[in-house]
Amino acid sequence: TTLFRSLEQILITSTSETYGTAQYVPIDEKRPLVGQSPYSASKIAADQLAISYYKSFELPIKLVRPFNTYGPRQSARAIIPTIISQLLNGKTEIELGSLSPTRDLTFVNDTCIGLEDIYKSNSLFGQVTNIGMNSEISIGNLAQLIAKTMNIQLTIKSREERIRPENSEVERLLCDNLKLLKHTDWNPKYSLEQGITEVIEWMKKPENLNYFKSDRYNV
């Protein structure tokens, strides 16, 4: 208890996947939580435990829900490096899962600034705050945007083994970031096009591209 009371604050990083498929858009912090996958269910449990410590012991927590963050050094299983690595390895026909789900994508630098701004805020203790761009793009259109940025004519093959189970797939994510904008000075610097260009330039370096095995499905 003494240690807890000496802490200035704790930021708990959650995920937009705790909201499940959008019941309304944009998705605000009041949206009921839905565990559509073991990952999101585990994050919901962690979120609720953190809130319980705030309510029971006044632990100074702030709970942050970033929507999809991307950038250099991202896991090979994420959609943007999956697309870019296949294209950089000479493929013009790439393999993806479902093309219809939409995602709200924030460049990693902007997400980090959002975390810092939430930390600096004098409010938001014991509350949830979204971080996202309030903009969505489908997986299919994202792949085409990346190909256009790389000046590549692209064909997409949707492979069944890459498609998430129907009841697990989050079909639509679009962030309501009004709470973040109200309580902080957050001002994202990167458009989707700028962020994608940063990732492409980083992945072009052979020592970086070697981390990504485009010939296999990373799960």
Identify the residue ranges that each predicted region occupies:
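A short C-terminal helix-loop "cap" of Rossmann-like NAD(P)-dependent dehydrogenase/epimerase domains
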Residues: F57-P60, I84-E95, S121, T149-E161, ...
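C-terminal "lid/loop" region of Rossmann-like NAD(P)-dependent oxidoreductases
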Residues: S98, Q127-T129, S138-A143, N151-R172, ...
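Glycine/proline-rich active-site loop of Rossmann-fold NAD(P)-dependent oxidoreductases
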Residues: I44, T69-T82, G90-T92, V108-N109, ...
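Substrate-binding strand-loop-helix patch
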Residues: P72-R77, S100-I113, V128-K148, P188-E193, ...
